[in-house]
Amino acid sequence: EYNRRSGAPLPIQAHIFDSGPGYPRFWADIRAIRAGLPKNFFIRTFATAMLVVAYTIYKAIWWAKGLDNPIIMYAKLMNRPDLFPKNVPRAYIYSREDDMVQWKEVENHAAKAKELGYEVRAELFEGTQHVSHMPKDSKRYWGIVESVWKSSFREQ
């Protein structure tokens, strides 16, 4: 919306990707949606069945209308220089153990961003799940954030 009204990229100072972006994968997406469900076996099982049906219907509608999945759309938008300036430093924080977003997808997005001229830093954490890198190693996590933030103030 900002870009549409101003004709300029979003005036951000730094860009941190924590556990993403990824691409839609049926069961990974269902796991992500299920994360907020109650732990009760019966409720969780019933809700999961309903999620599978609803998600399948939504995917069919997107496909029938020729629309990109919103997750794919988001990933594409993040690498558009008319929306996000290339001189803004960005960090990708991710892990191989994430069962919601595959690490190769994060690395592919970072590589594409680098090809396009973005300033990219990729930080692979070991043994952490989706968006749980900070609790596992808060010193390293906040060090990355601080470093990216500080690098954003150099002369551009």
Where are these regions (language model features)?
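Generic structural signal of hydrophobic/aromatic residues within well-ordered alpha-helices
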Residues: 30-33, 73-77, 145
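Catalytic active-site module of serine/aspartate enzymes centered on a nucleophile-bearing elbow/loop
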Residues: 135-156
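Serine-hydrolase catalytic core
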Residues: 48-140
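Alpha-helix termini
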Residues: 2-8, 80-81, 116-117, 153-156
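N-terminal pre-domain and mature-chain start segments
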Residues: 42-43, 109, 151
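Short linear functional motifs in flexible/disordered or boundary regions
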Residues: 27, 102-104, 153
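Serine-dependent carboxylesterase/thioesterase catalytic core
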Residues: 1-50
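A generic secondary-structure signal
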Residues: 2-5, 112, 147-148
